[in-house]
Amino acid sequence: MATPHINAEMGDFADVVLMPGDPLRAKYIAETFLEDAREVNNVRGMLGFTGTYKGRKISVMGHGMGIPSCSIYTKELITDFGVKKIIRVGSCGAVLPHVKLRDVVIGMGACTDSKVNRIRFKDHDFAAIADFDMVRNAVDAAKALGVDARVGNLFSADLFYSPDGEMFDVMEKYGILGVEMEAAGIYGVAAEFGAKALTICTVSDHIRTHEQTTAAERQTTFNDMIKIALESVLLGNKE
C-alpha cells in the first residue's frame, strides 16, 4: 500500500534496494545496469525503479540529502514494502592524506554529529554499524572487480557547510575515511526495524587539499561503486 512518500504497492520493490542521494542517479543506475527496469515511485520526484541484474530482482531509489530525508524513505521501504537490505551508494569527502580522489570507501561504521540515534536509543550512544555479511560481500566483490576499496568509519554530518573546521582535525585523528550525510541514520533505521544496511561511497573531493573530481571522473568511479554494490548482492544470494 502506498505511503505518504512512496506511491508503490507491496511487491513493487525487491528485497534489496540500492539508494543514491540523487533520484536522477537512481534513474541512471536503472537504465545502465538493470534489465526490464520499471518506475515504481515518483512522489516528490524521488524516483524509484525495479528491474533485474543478472537475473536477480533489485530496486534502486533516491533518498535525498541528509539523515531526515533518507530516514523517511528507508523506514517506509522496510516497514511498508518488505525491503530487507539497503545499500547506500553515494559520494563522500576525504580528510586523511592517504585517502585519494576516486577511492571507493566501504562504510563499516558511521560516526555522526546528529542526535537521531540518541533519540531512538534513549539518549545513549548507539554503535551505527553496517551488516557484517554485507561488508564482507562488498569487499569480496571489489576484489573480484579489481577495485582497491577502503574499509572503515564514515562521519555523517548534519551540516554540509560546517562552521567548525577543527572537527576535521578530530576526524583525521580518529581515522575517518569519508565525510557524508546519511550512513549513520540509515544504519540506525535498519537496526530499529530489523533490516540490514551498508554504505559504499566514492571520494568526490578532498576537504584538506580542496581537490575535486570532474564530472567525467565521478561518473567512471561511480560505475565502479555500483558494480561493487550489485555484485555484492549476488554474493549475498549464496549465503
Curated annotation (Swiss-Prot):
Residue(s) carrying N6-acetyllysine: K27
GO MF term set: purine-nucleoside phosphorylase activity
GO cellular component, as recorded: cytosol
Active site, renumbered: D205
Residue positions binding a purine D-ribonucleoside: H5, E180, M181, E182, S204, D205
Gene Ontology process terms (BP): purine nucleoside catabolic process
Site, as annotated: Important for catalytic activity: R218
Transmembrane regions: none
EC number(s) recorded for this UniProt protein: 2.4.2.1
Binding positions (phosphate): G21, R25, R44, R88, V89, G90, S91
First-level EC class: transferase
Annotated keywords: Acetylation, Glycosyltransferase, Transferase
PROSITE patterns: PNP_UDP_1
Catalytic activity: a purine D-ribonucleoside + phosphate = a purine nucleobase + alpha-D-ribose 1-phosphate; a purine 2'-deoxy-D-ribonucleoside + phosphate = a purine nucleobase + 2-deoxy-alpha-D-ribose 1-phosphate
NCBIfam families: deoD, PRK05819.1, PRK13374.1
Record's subunit section: Homohexamer; trimer of homodimers.
Family note: Belongs to the PNP/UDP phosphorylase family.
Chain's role: Catalyzes the reversible phosphorolytic breakdown of the N-glycosidic bond in the beta-(deoxy)ribonucleoside molecules, with the formation of the corresponding free purine bases and pentose-1-phosphate.
Name the record gives this protein: Purine nucleoside phosphorylase DeoD-type
The organism of origin for this protein: Shigella dysenteriae serotype 1 (strain Sd197)
Gene: deoD
